[in-house]
Amino acid sequence: MRSLAPAMSRSTTHIARAIAWILASAGVWVAAAGDPLYAAAGDTLAKVKTRGTLRCGVSEGIAGFSRKDPSGRWSGLDADFCRAVAAAALGDGNKVTFVPLRASARFPALRGGTIDVLARNTTWTLAREAGLQVRFAGVLFYDGQGFMVPAKSRVKSLAKLKGATVCVEKGTTTEEILEHHSKATSLGIKTLVLDSLLEAAKAFFASRCKAMSGDAATLATVRVDAPGGAQAFVILPERISKEPLAPVVRAQDEDWLTLVRWVLNVLVAAEELGITSQNARKRMADPSLERGLHATEEVSRALGTDGDWPLRVVESVGNYGEMFERNLGQGSPFKLERGLNAQWTQGGLMYSPPFR
């Protein structure tokens, strides 16, 4: 996966405009938190324990992130994160009910209490956190908005898409970002908005659009299943946004947010420390290990779970690196490079706050 660094400077010009737009709309959005869709604040963990299963919102089928195979098993980075949370909360990573959602339905499902946590390629933004009364638990995957074109088109850069029609998925940040970028660069791009990622991909492959836009990693997974094979399509090098994809929970349940956040931190810290699904039991018994990874009874009680929850998390799905390689990296059909999702010691952005 290519570096997103160039996108940072290109997207800076949109920041002031975006903030102004967010603030102008904030009164309406905050008021919306009181509507019937907004579930009453409560102890999500207690409800999960009473139910005996974690209800996790995922995509309707984005390979590498969350997709159900013919046997009915869900796989992908997001699906594995759901299992990690279930392992911490319920003691068993298999106690998950996966709830497939279109992008436009994900926040109503979370706010209305249909799901306990959302792990569905969701970008962490100020507008969403402040306006929708949700909380993001940390970045699970760093991405950026990109473009895919047919290889035979010989389009090599975004500038060559001037005046083109581009397919996008409804209910995502993609359409808005593309509109801003098109105006700022005078590209005159027109969007064809489809109800789901699958429909957007079908329209693109049917030549209804000259390009398809979305998170670059998602485009890479879509390309693998493309008619004519992956080699028939090219992902352009430009990125026009930063897309930190993060698990989401409802606001006003800080205890649940803390548990979900530190499940993610355990996965990241375990990779840095060389703790894997195979050696976790031995390594986590090492008294020299950072104190928090031993999960003292005092800390575990504060989180509302059992003392060995970090061990259960890693034994259930492996560390972050294992999850990445299995679902998106060299052990997958997509062969994505770690890029920004590498450990901080390897030039990436992934690291955990201290556990002490």
Show the residue positions of the predicted features.
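Bacterial N-terminal signal peptides that target proteins for export
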Residues: R2-I22
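Bacterial N-terminal signal peptides
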Residues: R17-P36
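Extracytoplasmic small-molecule ligand-binding "clamshell" domains
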Residues: L37-N121, T296, L303-T305, P310, ...
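Extended ligand-binding regions for polar small-molecule ligands
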Residues: Y38, D80-R83, A87-A89, K152-V155, ...
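Short, hydrophobic alpha-helical packing/hinge segments within bilobed ligand-binding/sensory domains
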Residues: T44, F81-C82, A105-L110, L197-A203, ...
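Sec-exported extracytoplasmic/periplasmic mature domains
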Residues: K49-T53, A86-G91, R111-I115, K152, ...
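Bilobed "Venus flytrap"/periplasmic-binding protein-like clamshell domains
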Residues: R55-G64, W74-A89, T123, D143-E199
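Acidic, polar ligand-binding/catalytic clefts
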Residues: R83, A87, G91, K95-K160, ...
